[in-house]
A protein has these predicted regions:
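GH16 jelly-roll
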Residues: 1-218
Length: 218
């Protein structure tokens, strides 16, 4: 990631994060990440982004949140909320659809495995180091059209929306920690990585993740 205007800039009212194939500091690709850590951290509310996704296989755009106590507790104990991730359709064995997007809730090892393993329409993971629950849905025209990706964060539950439609609800009654502490926001565009099993389209030169706005309502 760099802070160069080649990779991140505001233009015509949009935040553009651009990934490029180029030789830079010994790396094959460049891109950017922006965050609000130590600048804007908050607890509860509605968090929303309107964006258009980059149109290249191998891109991994994300809009997510991390616990503000990350530096002291570390991950995954600080908690992570993935409001949007896109790109793993290139490795999906069940849904080969460029419109596939997902949201997830990550937290430390939990005693409430049976509760979260049975949330409808979700995928539950227990890696030993962390637990997380992920939900998937599909959208139309992810590269041509803007869509809104939202999280409604309350003391008792997390609700994830795409274009105002609820598709993932995570109860917090038994697992409020670490989601009862302030979090900060991040937006980034990765290239390859485990999300795509390292795959990047051979003809890739550059792609842009275009963000119209990010809003927090409290």
């Amino acid at each position: 990631y760099t802070d160069r205007e080649d990779n991140i800039k505001v233009e015509d009212g949009f935040l553009n994060i651009t990934a490029k194939r180029e030789d830079f500091s010994g790396k094959l690709y460049t891109s950017a990440r922006i965050h609000t850590q130590d600048k804007y951290e908050f607890k509860y509310g509605r968090i929303e982004m309107r964006a258009k996704l980059p149109n290249w296989e191998g891109m991994w755009p994300a809009f997510w949140m991390m616990g503000a106590n990350y530096d002291t507790l570390g991950w995954p104990f600080c908690g992570e909320l993935d409001i949007l991730e896109h790109g793993d359709y290139v490795k999906s064995s069940t849904i080969d659809d460029p419109g596939l997007i997902s949201s997830a809730v990550h937290y430390g090892p939990s005693d409430h495995k049976s509760q979260y393993a049975t949330i409808p329409n979700t995928i539950y993971f227990d890696t030993g180091q962390e637990n997380f629950v992920r939900a998937e849905t599909t959208i139309e025209n992810p590269f041509e059209d803007f869509h809104t990706y939202s999280l409604q964060w309350a003391p008792d539950k997390l609700e994830f929306y795409v274009d105002e439609e609820l598709y993932f609800e995570f109860p917090l009654a038994s697992q409020s920690s670490p989601f009862d502490k302030p979090f900060f926001m991040l937006i980034n565009l990765a290239v390859g990585g485990h999300w795509t099993d390292g795959f990047v389209a051979s003809g890739f030169t550059e792609a842009t993740y275009k963000i119209d706005y990010v809003r927090v309502y409290q």
